[in-house]
Amino acid sequence: GNFFAKANYQVTEQLSLFGDLQYRHVQYKADSPETGLVNDTFRFFNPKAGLNYKFDEANTMYFSYARANREPNRTDYENGGVRPETLDDVELGWRLNNEKIQLNTNIYYMAYKNQLILTGKLDDVGAPIRSNSEKSYRLGLEVDATIALSEQWMVRPNFTLSANKNVDLNVTGTYYGTKDIAYSPSVIVGNVLVFSPIKALHLSLLQKFVGEQLMNNIELPAAKLADYFVNDFNVSYTFKPKTIFKEIVLSGLVNNFLDKKYVSNGYMYDIYPSYYPQAGINFLAGLNLKF
């Protein structure tokens, strides 16, 4: 079952308040060789509240607090007893919006109890295994922008800087202290540069950098995934025929056009790493017909 309520209140021309309430009732019943006997009932109350303050037409700040609960999934039950996770999320942000730039900045602190984290291991059918981290957090800064450099040029940068930590981690009776959460890079940077020599033609350079990350939660050196930087190129041209179709869009995408050899994911078997290498240079073409 699910119940949801939402309210907004305009205090002044500049200040507005909002609140959300959600109640979820989840019941799991199963009896199989994979899961064993399961008869669990979860009752989650997920509130959210915050405020927006508009300084002027271009600048707005916001603050919010939310609690979210999440139940384990079937795969979690198949791989051992796990508990639902609870998240307390606090966010503070600023939005700038004018004719030449749209800028969004957000600072977040996410405090978890029993966070369901990836362990880096796979089960016998290749599904990722998760377990509970009794206490953990994610603290970060997110920034994205759209900047009009001229009528022909536009740039859309974004980045995330974060610290993602298990606190007082204990794995099968061994104490590890505070360690990085698996598959959680602390630096992610992206950019899109768009050139439109004419209105119908768009040429885009897409770039992404992902910092190093780990494939387990105890910072084993062998579990490290190196950082990588990938470049893609996209071109699109729009026709506006007078009959049948309102619009025809031709597009082409060259992924990893520098043919970079990199690994973006992997898993651990005990202390031994395995990797998923990504494709080198590859091409896609598209045709979009709009009636």
Residue ranges and their predicted role:
Residues 14, 56-58, 100, 152, ...:
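Short loop/turn motifs that connect adjacent beta-strands in outer-membrane beta-barrel proteins
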Residues 54, 60-66, 84-170, 255, ...:
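Membrane-embedded beta-barrel scaffold of Gram-negative outer-membrane proteins
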Residues 13-17, 26, 109, 131-218, ...:
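Gram-negative outer-membrane beta-barrel transporters
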Residues 1-4, 44-47, 87-93, 102, ...:
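Transmembrane beta-barrel architecture of outer-membrane proteins
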Residues 63, 90-92, 180-291:
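Conserved C-terminal beta-signal and adjacent last beta-strands/turns
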Residues 1-54, 77, 171:
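Signature of Gram-negative outer-membrane beta-barrel scaffolds
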Residues 29-36, 72-80, 115-124, 162, ...:
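Outer-membrane beta-barrel translocator domains and adjoining extracellular loop/strand segments
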